[in-house]
């Protein structure tokens, strides 16, 4: 078993830029694409994800330190440190159940596709770590591998069904036809879609419109996404207490993210569409006319400027929430730069209305902080024995992403009732 576990971890360590091209190439062959066409699709998607993750790296490396400086300037002192998704995923893959999740997840997805329970073929294998973490939490309280695997399957099924539900949004708003998102962190904020719809019925608030197109019409060239990124970056730099040169550098970096990300997503779609069409043709021949979606990393939604704009505004709001919310013990840190991933569905439901997205995003993040506070004890216990080190000055750790994930939390609490 240890050899198999090492193989799985070694494969995952290759990252999405290697895993996805391989998976897409094999899928292309399976769906009767010619070898050259399948290879080109896989290679194009690999190149696109290299570009996407380079832009994300630019975002994280610049926004992360700025957010941390903001926390330091406010003199915030809380007992639980948000260690971020990299540490959380390490805890997940170090668990006793980790080796079973990927093969089980693939089997479950195939069965649900064949039985027409889902329309999503999720190739985002790397993000199976979300299911793995849920399984690890349940295993920690139950000691039962069967309960742990069942918990992972429940989370996966929920993710696939939400991915099906939101796929039309991905096509209509994000201009990503045939694509769905089943990433666990993004799925967690799907209830925010209902809050957006509720907000759109509130007199006064429903008249506030600040989507990128409206902003551009109102401010002309200065309303373009490149200028919005610059202004938001400069604002965060000021709040972080940066020197003038560093403020300008942060502004330029955020402007670059706004411009480059949509272009990387276009390259991704160039590689994905042939495979998606081949899959749809193959399935229609065997199972009748039906829609099929390719499940991808939530990073593809970051191509819309309203997502990045909303996330940048929510960074200082998240820090402020941590200070003023009674009972919260989590100090936002590692996951501040992952906010763009969790708000994607909210922004899509709001049709890019940044004001509505920020309001609903604030509510959802507040909920995440409370959940992350509640699971901090078991989160900390799970981290013991792994390579995750406790930050200095903290008694416990958690994360806003998976630790504050409401789907993960509900599943964990459900199984806790019986153990």
Please describe what each predicted stretch is:
Residues 1-55, 96-293, 320, 343, ...:
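Signature of multi-pass transmembrane helix bundles
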Residues 20-23, 63, 68-88, 200, ...:
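Helix-loop-helix junctions within the multi-pass membrane cores of secondary transporters/permeases
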